[in-house]
Amino acid sequence: MANIKSQKKRVLTNEKAHLRNVAVKSGLKTAIRATREAIAAGDKAAAEAAYKVAAQKLDKAAGAGVIHKNQAANRKSGLAVAINAL
């Protein structure tokens, strides 16, 4: 454990941020999985609706610094290509 007061505060802040980031990443995975399942089922309307949610979550995560903006763009692009192939 840290001895310096500011470092003790940073440990708590980092722990909160870590928990928040884990929750955001979990939501991302769920949204992407829902999109991929709709694509696998061949349901274009459901896939597009799920993609809209996933794209929004990806953009928010990138904006918050949870994932890199290029990673968000790559994931959105991959999902869009799969949906357009339906």
Curated annotation (Swiss-Prot):
Gene assigned in the entry: rpsT
Regions annotated as coiled coil: none
Keywords: Ribonucleoprotein, Ribosomal protein, RNA-binding, rRNA-binding
GO molecular function term, any single one: structural constituent of ribosome
Role noted for this protein: Binds directly to 16S ribosomal RNA.
NCBIfam families (UniProt xref): S20 (TIGR00029)
Protein name as catalogued: Small ribosomal subunit protein bS20
GO BP: translation
Any one Gene Ontology cellular component term annotated for this protein: cytosol
Family that this chain belongs to: Belongs to the bacterial ribosomal protein bS20 family.
